[in-house]
Amino acid sequence: MEGMDVDLDAELMQKFSCLGTTDKDVLIGEFQRLLGFQLSPAGCAFFLDMTNWNLQAAIGAYYDFESPNINVPSMSFVEDVTIGEGESIPPDTQFTKTWRIQNTGTEVWPPGVCLKYVGGDQFGHVNMVMVRSLEPQEIADVSVQMCSPSTAGMYQGQWRMCTATGLYYGDVIWVILSVEVGGLLGVTQQLSSFETEFNTQPHRKVEGNFNPFASPQKNRQPDENNLKDPGGSELGTISKNTWGPAPDQIEQDQNGLSQNSVNLSPSSHSNNLSVVTYSKGFHGPYPFGQS
């Protein structure tokens, strides 16, 4: 009988130890936090259920059973290289967060690792981004597309590296965001993207004597002075240094119009301009009759 009392007392003590934290979600979250987010929620639930949802016993079981068999990768957070880091951002604005990380271990990372959201504010719908397997001591930048909350204030969230099997490793990466109506982070990143796009576009080769404000004739080569029609006949010659009557102008009709040439010679201009002379006459029909 006394043995039964001892067993009942032990069972009651076990139940009393779990009375303060009967919410399974709370226990799972606390289990994750104490392990430094090294185990997925499903893994935490497994150890808690195995120990009758006793948090202390579950942690002991995890270290006794899992730790000797786990080869955890290593990762160190190097720096935040986000464009405009430290600036506030307007509400409901897209932005990109970029972190520099390093594999500080002695082995290459396993395939399928990712940077995953683990707590706090998420900033958009993206909760993970795939990361390539880094060699030992290799450094890489990881970017995540985010969106600021719709209400002004201070926000924070946590991200961690995670293996394909759900094992978290490395430093916790914090996102601390100041949301203000007059924030400039979104504009800063847009201007930076425009500058990057402009610098990556191919540039045209411009000659030293090229004048962007001159007429097309000014930038042509000397051998482009003679103009010919598609049939090969010469239409005219561009004269650069003369402004006067065309040499082949022979006669004018009674109305002062020439049938054989067109001559432009306004007396009000004293500078040298180009003159186009048409050496071939126009041949009927004549809309006003032939003089």
UniProtKB/Swiss-Prot annotation:
One of its GO terms (molecular function) is ubiquitin binding. May have a roles as negative regulator of innate antiviral response. Residues 199-275 are annotated as: Disordered. It is found in: Cytoplasm; Nucleus. Keywords: Cytoplasm, Immunity, Innate immunity, Nucleus. It comes from Gallus gallus (Chicken). Pfam families: N_BRCA1_IG (PF16158), UBA_4 (PF14555). Residues 257-275 have a biased composition (Low complexity). This is Protein ILRUN. GO terms for biological process: innate immune response; macroautophagy; negative regulation of defense response to virus; negative regulation of protein localization to nucleus; negative regulation of tumor necrosis factor production; negative regulation of type I interferon production. GO terms for cellular component: centrosome; cytosol; nuclear speck; phagophore assembly site. SUPFAM superfamilies: UBA-like.
